[in-house]
UniProtKB/Swiss-Prot annotation:
It comes from Buchnera aphidicola subsp. Schizaphis graminum (strain Sg). Pfam families: TGT. One of its GO terms (biological process) is queuosine biosynthetic process. This is Queuine tRNA-ribosyltransferase. One of its GO terms (cellular component) is cytosol. Homodimer. Within each dimer, one monomer is responsible for RNA recognition and catalysis, while the other monomer binds to the replacement base PreQ1. It catalyses: 7-aminomethyl-7-carbaguanine + guanosine(34) in tRNA = 7-aminomethyl-7-carbaguanosine(34) in tRNA + guanine. NCBIfam families: Q_tRNA_tgt, tgt_general.
Length: 368
């Protein structure tokens, strides 16, 4: 299950994972299936968008349906009938997103279950056990994600705690893993402070993770700040290891990050935006709720080969959205994910052909 960099165009990389015969080419975008499903789609529909690896959330699955239920099926893959690889998030981001429901201690985090109000204690060790029981192909260490604009002292304290939890995650993963083919990724923290990011990465490299993620981004910083940080930290990540930018993002974010050497992405944006009627097309975004689409008989995007664009008009999609029909969310999601996966396919081809700069230029020119 080794990662290989196959070709490179400046900093942009075309790579490959082999998960038991499932070949995953990078740069890759992973749709978010928090609860073991990409909202509104069945497995065949997910596959037909070109998606080959998905992300699920270990903490949310631990709360519902529960670790034991998934173990009855043998793995999360069996539970949801998905035969591709799965990456699971550890629950660290929920320290940020569910901050009103948790209290952080050095040993772990006391969460208040948002479903039934009961308290539970999540530790690095428990997070590893949950993810191992899920059968995750890529397991994320348990970390503390904080807001980007915290002061230096608070950011340093959180970064050091994440390093401590990373060591504990590494030890417990090595002790409990059932399969040598599971991968464990470390997460680089340090907020907006390059010196703290440097320390975080240096210590994580000593722990020899299978890949390295950049955490604590897409949480309020500007694009320029994110790009500046990527320019600084990405070249320091071991070249033979995959680089994962968590929670990012818009199509232009993916392109700018690939340009800076990132290999892996996940984000709720294409699926969440689809449910809100924001659809990505070659020349920008269509807000299908706009009344001007009521009598528009054209397809969403003439260049798109997705099921939605091959079968339905903008007028029909506008109608479904105005009636709040479930089918509307489904067709929109199919389109947005297909758009993202086609974008990644074209990015990979451009890197292979050493034409990534030309691809980037054409991408932005189409948006004008």
């Amino acid at each position: 299950m080794k990662f290989q960099v196959i070709s490179q165009d400046k900093e942009a990389r075309h790579g490959m994972f082999n998960f038991n015969g499932n070949i995953i080419e990078t740069p890759v975008f992973m749709p978010v299936g928090t609860y073991g499903t990409v909202k509104s789609l069945n497995i065949e529909e997910i596959k037909n968008t070109g998606s080959k690896i998905i992300l699920s959330n270990a903490l949310h699955l631990y709360l519902r349906p529960g670790q034991d239920i998934i173990k009855l099926h043998g793995s999360l893959h069996n539970f949801m009938n998905w035969n591709g690889p799965i990456l699971t998030d550890s629950g660290g981001f929920q320290i940020f997103s569910l901050s009103n429901f948790c209290r952080i201690k050095e040993e772990g985090v006391i969460f208040k279950n948002h479903i039934n109000g009961k308290k539970f204690f999540l530790t690095p060790e428990l997070s590893m056990e949950i993810q191992i029981d899920l059968g995750s192909n890529i397991i994320m260490i348990f970390d503390e994600c904080i807001a980007y604009n915290k002061d230096w002292e608070k950011t340093k304290f959180a970064m050091e705690r994440s390093l401590n939890w990373s060591r504990r995650s590494r030890i417990h993963f090595d002790l409990k893993k059932k399969n040598k083919k599971n991968l464990l990724f470390g997460i680089i923290h340090g907020g907006s402070y390059k010196s703290l990011r440097d320390i975080s990465l240096k210590e994580l490299i000593k722990m020899d993770f299978d890949g390295y993620a950049l955490g604590g981004l897409a949480v309020g910083e500007s694009k320029l700040e994110m790009h500046d940080l990527l320019d600084h930290i990405t070249p320091q990540i071991p070249k033979k290891k995959p680089r994962y930018l968590m929670g990012v993002g818009k199509p232009e974010d993916l392109i700018e990050s690939v340009y800076r050497g990132i290999d892996m992405f996940d984000c709720v944006l294409p699926t969440r935006n689809a449910r809100n009627g924001h659809l990505f097309v070659t020349n920008g975004i269509i807000k299908i709720r706009n009344a001007k689409y009521k009598k528009d008989l054209s397809v969403l995007d003439k260049k798109c080969t997705c099921y939605t664009c091959q079968n339905y008009s903008r007028s029909y999609l506008h109608h479904l959205d105005s009636c709040n029909e479930i089918l509307g969310a489904r067709l929109n999601t199919i389109h947005n994910l297909h758009y993202y996966q086609t974008l990644m396919f074209n990015i990979r081809n451009a890197i292979k052909q050493k034409k990534f700069d030309e691809f980037v230029s054409n991408f932005y020119n189409q948006k004008k």
